[in-house]
């Protein structure tokens, strides 16, 4: 009799609309209960039985119950699941399989089965890619997943690489494909094979993108010719190889090995500017005045070159610093190094005064054994030879940015607009408290930004610099010319790494159109989005593999008294993050390790400081000694404590 009663339906509707609800993200804890985080200030308790319906990270709507003045959340509707596609470790065997997601806060095994068409017979310990198929908040009885791809077996030494690449859905190997012959592009190539071009790279580099040649003119000015490998001489736009490169967007450099954007036959051989091999190149010739200014008379042209020497950064640096035993093989090569060194010094000086120069940070290189074991991690400082190449590349990219802007009005540009305008007032206020006075309007201009950066670089420590970093905007890839505040330049378009960056291949095609005086279409916007997304994924993959290798490397130091110098890079409510100076590993120091009495301890992310009893004891950029307390292999996290 109540079945179709409109009054009852109305009452139900009323009760439903009057029941308080909240939307937020589920945060799990290790104790079985959880919280619904609505915003930074408000969260609701989720009791353990209700947590069985949801997963850490799910965005849900929950009904809020109040009992004895205690609020709790009952999950009601799924807005966005945290897990869709994920990687994990398989448990069980044959017909009763489950998978534990590889995530620090997801500990529960999810029942699963092999998806249709997946031939592999899964067993305990296998790594797999899975996709969620059922969720309790979608009316299903429980969570359930399909195993869509086998990654590797439990004891594979290369688990960090294969699992990370599968997690980010990135390619595991070089693309297939061959380029049989060079295209007829209708370009006149200048024969520069007689000139003493040299390449300077790491000793192990095979994909040499750039060769340099310098000469002194009669009036004392220096002329620099930058010759860049020419993959677009082999790869036609829209071809299969081109489309593959477009999807990959970059060569993916991981510790221990790389996954190239182009087939290795091209990247490491046909296009690589190997010593004593004749190669096609795209070249830029510029004249540099004594003060480092680049003359307006910039020439881009197609060429044929033959590198006369494959030089290594360390050898060249040692020679310029009068160290070591290495010598250039002849006077011609020695003269090239001297001239390139002069260009480097004058360009560096120019950038100090008219643009911005990054502080040198070391690169960390993993030395790996046959089985992927970490034998050592070496900090490689950026030396004078690295700077010679860097200054030449920045100059060449600045030239390309100008030419593409003036001749076409578009290209693939790296654009960075400095500070987000919404943050300008807060930034000025923060700087004022530290005795630096800036105009909130002026700091949004390229000149104002450069002026501030120079003042910050002159500070005794990097503390203030670290505080304002959160106000900065991110660098973007754009088809529209625009300034690059981070470099302090009016425009910046890279074309010097076409073997490893698809955007540089596009700029090559645009520059060739300029050389031939032909019209060419503006690149599609979606390509810049693809490049930005791939750059993000590649960086995450590099970080994930690094975390895994750092955990392996430091595992035997856990619980020992071995001390490491560590720079504080971040402070949060829960503690501090530090970077070990000698090897680059990131470790976390939990707040209880800083001071035992919680009420006397204030960890402020806002100020970048840790105070004990009102005294600032630690701040971001401080370097302190730490020991390794614990290494958690399953989450690849390193826990440190201040050394006693």
Swiss-Prot record:
SMART domains per UniProt: CSP, RNB
Keyword Zinc: no
Reaction catalyzed: Exonucleolytic cleavage in the 3'- to 5'-direction to yield nucleoside 5'-phosphates
Keyword RNA-binding: yes
PROSITE patterns in UniProt: RIBONUCLEASE_II
UniProt-listed Enzyme Commission number(s): 3.1.13.1
The organism's place on the tree of life at top rank: Bacteria
Domain spans labelled RNB: 189-516
Any one GO biological process: mRNA catabolic process
GO function term, MF aspect, one: exoribonuclease II activity
Keywords annotated in UniProt: Cytoplasm, Exonuclease, Hydrolase, Nuclease, RNA-binding
Annotated disulfide bonds: none
Sequence similarity: Belongs to the RNR ribonuclease family. RNase II subfamily.
Physiological role: Involved in mRNA degradation. Hydrolyzes single-stranded polyribonucleotides processively in the 3' to 5' direction.
Protein name: Exoribonuclease 2
Encoding gene per record: rnb
